[in-house]
C-alpha cells in the first residue's frame, strides 16, 4: 500500500479493553458501545474473541448484524478452529475482518509456544490462508513484536503478506519500547520486509511505562498507518493507547504529523462517558481530553487569559471534543418527545419503545426529586435502567434502612432473582454493610467485595449518586453499577448488578490461552 496521510483507527475497547479486571460486558452493553464507536467514526471495531466462549461468539455475531459503517473484526489465535469461528461470527457484517496472531519473540516461542521459528512461520501462513476463505480483509499480528528479532519479523511478515494478509500489526505487548526506538523499528522493519509496501502497517501499544500514546505516534512517524487503541485507554495491566489522545494529538499537531483520521471528535466525550459508566472504570479528573478537569483553570492568571482569549491557555476547545457548554437538559414538565430528542442529541440510542418508555418513567421520577436535569444525569439514568433491563438475574425492587446513633443499622430489602421476589434483612457495621449482608443472606454468592465507590454525577446536594461495586469469585472479577438520588438505593442496585454479571460471566468460560496481543 502506498504511503497515505489517512490513519486507520482500530478500536479494541470491546476486546482488549474488556480484559481489564471487572470490565466484562454483557452482549447488550457491547452492542451499545459498538454503536457509539461507529458514531465516533472508528474504522475498525474489534468486537471480541469469538472462539473464547459461546457468549463471546454471540456478542461478536450480534455486533456484526448491527454495525453497517465500521468494519467488524474478531481476534483469533493462529488455530484453525479459532479462525473458522471468527469467520462465522463476523459473516453478517457488511465489512468484516479476521485478526489472527502468533507470538514471535524468542522467549514466547521457546517457553510459551514451544515451537521453532520455522514452525511459527508455517502456522502463521496457514492461519492467514484459512482466514482468507472468509474475507479479503485479514490482519496478522506478531505478538510481542517489539522484543522480537527484526530479521525474523521481516521473514514472517513477508510470508504472511504473500499468503494474503492485508494489514500487519506490530504490538508492543508488554509496553517495553520507547518512542524513538519504536519509530526506528517500524522504519527498518517495513524496509526489510518483502512486499512491505503493499500492506497497511499497524501499531498496538500497551501502557506499562506510560508511553502507549507516544509509541503509537512514533510508529506513525515510522510508517504505520493504523493504530490500535481503546476508549479511555482501557485495558489490562496499565491499559492501552488512548483513542482520544491519539486522535487529538494528530489533530492539534497536524503541523508536525500531516495525518488525518475519520473521527468525529465531538463524539469523544460521549464515548468516554458511556464506556466509563458501563465498565465501572471512572475517568480520573486530570485525564487528558476527557477528564473533568481537562478544561478547568484554577490559576488567576490563566483564568484571566482564557477570558480574554481562550487560545492563550487552551490548545483545543472543550466543544470540539464533545464537552457541552450548556449542560442544562430537561425539567419535570418535559414530555416524551423532548426526552427522546435529547437522548438522540447525546448519542444515546435505545433499542425499543419498551426501553424508551422505561427510561422516560425513570426520568419523570428523577425530575420529581431534582429540579435541574443535566446531560450527565441522563447518561447515568439510562445506563442504570438498561443495566436493570438487560441483567435479568437480580433486580432491585425496594428497601428500608433504619439507623440510629449507637445502634447497628438495619437493612430490609426486596429484590428479585430471575423474576422471583425475595425479601431479606440484616444488620451491619454501617448501612452499606447491612445492605450487602442482607442481599448475600439470600444470594449466597460467595463473592468477595474488592471495591465500593460513590461518585456524584453532577454538582449540588440533589445530585444522583453513581455507585460502583467490584466483586471477585475465583478468577472472575466483575463491576456493577447503580444510580439514584438515594446513594443507598444506588448501592443496592450496584451490588445486584454485579451479582448478575458474576452469574453471566460464570456461564461463559473462556477458552484456555485466549490471551492478548
Swiss-Prot record:
GO terms for molecular function: 2-isopropylmalate synthase activity; acetyl-CoA C-acetyltransferase activity; manganese ion binding. Inhibited by 3-bromo substituents and Leu, the pathway end product. Pathway: Amino-acid biosynthesis; L-leucine biosynthesis; L-leucine from 3-methyl-2-oxobutanoate: step 1/4. GO terms for biological process: L-leucine biosynthetic process. Residues 7-269 form the Pyruvate carboxyltransferase domain. Optimum temperature is 40 degrees Celsius. Thermostable up to 44 degrees Celsius, in the presence of Leu thermostable to 59 degrees Celsius, in the presence of Leu and 3-methyl-2-oxobutanoate or Leu and acetyl-CoA thermostable until 61-62 degrees Celsius. Disulfide bonds: none annotated. Belongs to the alpha-IPM synthase/homocitrate synthase family. LeuA type 1 subfamily. NCBIfam families: leuA_bact, PRK00915.1-3, PRK00915.1-4. This is 2-isopropylmalate synthase.
